[in-house]
């Protein structure tokens, strides 16, 4: 004889209390404990399971938030209240009904119900701390691991001139004078060519490229790389530049020697901009690495590989800016805007300063090849 099916009803109290219980609301069962629910009530009863409804307002729960199953609305309300340390007042008797329809009518009673149902203020603070730690981990990880800015900074510091005293360049009008600005700049560039190769070797992945490609990249970008360096070194100098040899060349001296126009461009488009934004050495190193990894350099065996390296520097620099200067969202773009000026000035400097004659009778490719094949000269 079949056992008659028993109908079970779910007892619910008042709307306020309906969402206040943390006990599971059992669905009706048929034979052998198997759920037997009319089709039209399946959706309603599945939502009545505690973990599927918001303990605060009865809306659909999106999961456990701050210790309590709740909807996104109540989760966000509680988080905002705690993070901004907000206080509310009730216009009635502090017993307002909080349900899906009326949850926004009284913030005081809604917040009190959040606390009564077990939401934890400390869980909000812990979430913020975890997010901060995750952000720091991402900065030091995903975007940065292929092209660590720490290594780029190390490269900058390793080749930094160790000059202790700086000498004011003589303002002699004679172009043949040993203290002529053009001669001084050329001599400084001559010296810096050696350290430039050492710097490039320390940039992540540069030494992994074919030797011929290394030579091509340095030959294509070395004038811009040197100009970027002495421009940044000159941030603290008024109306002049500071060379790696320790000489300070004043703009008056440059004008007397006939290179005033390009000198002024260096001061206004590079030095002053770097000074105004307080560009740090990590950012300088990244900009120089971007110049170094130029996929448009003629003769490269694999331009796409060089382009991929440049994109890694972009990503690392952007992550660094967001982490180090979170209050300056446009800083990364502002840094990149210095590159066109650097390129233009670099081309002009080649016309004025005859850089390709700096190393005497040795062809620059031979010189670079010998330097790249040699072990690190700077420790």
Curated annotation (Swiss-Prot):
Highest taxon in the source lineage: Eukaryota
ZnF segments: NR C4-type: 54-74, 90-109
Binding annotation for 9-cis-retinoate: 233, 244
Positions bound to Zn(2+) 1: 54, 57, 71, 74
CDD domains recorded: NR_DBD_RXR (cd06956), NR_LBD_RXR_like (cd06943)
Coiled coil: none
Residues holding all-trans-retinoate: 233, 244
GO process terms (BP): cell differentiation; nervous system development; positive regulation of transcription by RNA polymerase II; retinoic acid receptor signaling pathway
Domain NR LBD span(s) in chain numbering: 144-375
Region annotation Required for nuclear export: where it falls in the sequence: 265-285
Region span, Nuclear localization signal: 79-84
Classification via InterPro entries: NHR-like_dom_sf (IPR035500), Nuc_recep-AF1 (IPR021780), Nucl_hrmn_rcpt_lig-bd (IPR000536), Nuclear_hormone_rcpt_NR2 (IPR050274), Nuclear_hrmn_rcpt (IPR001723), Retinoid-X_rcpt/HNF4 (IPR000003), Znf_hrmn_rcpt (IPR001628), Znf_NHR/GATA (IPR013088)
Region (Modulating): 1-53
Domain notes: Composed of three domains: a modulating N-terminal domain, a DNA-binding domain and a C-terminal ligand-binding domain.
Subunit structure: Homodimer. Heterodimer; with a rar molecule. Binds DNA preferentially as a rar/rxr heterodimer.
Protein name: Retinoic acid receptor RXR-alpha-B
Organism: Danio rerio (Zebrafish)
């Amino acid at each position: 004889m079949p056992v008659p099916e028993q109908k079970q009803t779910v007892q619910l109290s008042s709307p306020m209390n309906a969402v206040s219980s943390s006990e599971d609301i059992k669905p009706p069962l048929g034979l052998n404990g198997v759920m037997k629910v009319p089709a039209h009530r399946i959706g309603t009863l599945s939502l009545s399971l505690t973990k599927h409804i918001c303990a605060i307002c009865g809306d659909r729960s999106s999961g456990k938030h701050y210790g309590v199953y709740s909807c996104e609305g109540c989760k966000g309300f509680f988080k905002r209240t705690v993070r901004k340390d907000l206080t509310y007042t009730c216009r009635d008797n502090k017993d307002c009904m909080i349900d899906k329809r009326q949850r926004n009518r009284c913030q005081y009673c809604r917040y009190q119900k959040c606390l009564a149902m077990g939401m934890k203020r400390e869980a909000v603070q812990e979430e913020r701390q975890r997010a901060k730690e995750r952000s720091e981990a991402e900065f030091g990880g995903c975007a940065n691991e292929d092209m660590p800015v720490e290594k780029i900074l190390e490269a900058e510091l390793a080749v930094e001139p160790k000059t202790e005293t700086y000498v004011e360049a003589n303002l002699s009008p004679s172009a043949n004078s040993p203290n002529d600005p053009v001669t001084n700049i050329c001599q400084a560039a001559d010296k810096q060519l050696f350290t430039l190769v050492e710097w490039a070797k320390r940039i992540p992945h540069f030494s992994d490229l074919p030797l011929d490609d290394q030579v091509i990249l340095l030959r294509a970008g070395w004038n811009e790389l040197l100009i970027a360096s002495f421009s940044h070194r000159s941030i603290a100098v008024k109306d002049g530049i500071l060379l790696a040899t320790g000489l300070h060349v004043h703009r008056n001296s440059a004008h007397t020697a006939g290179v005033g126009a390009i000198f002024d461009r260096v001061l206004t488009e590079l030095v002053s901009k770097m000074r105004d934004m307080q560009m740090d050495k990590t950012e300088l190193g990244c900009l120089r690495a971007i110049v170094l990894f130029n996929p448009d350099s003629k003769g490269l065996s694999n331009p796409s590989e060089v382009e991929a390296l440049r994109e890694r520097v972009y990503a690392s620099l952007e992550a660094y800016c967001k982490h180090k200067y979170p209050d300056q969202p446009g800083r990364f773009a502002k840094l990149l805007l210095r590159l066109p000026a650097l390129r233009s000035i670099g081309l002009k400097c080649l016309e004025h300063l005859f850089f390709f004659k700096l190393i005497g009778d040795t062809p620059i490719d031979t010189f670079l090849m010998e330097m790249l094949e040699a072990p690190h000269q700077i420790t």
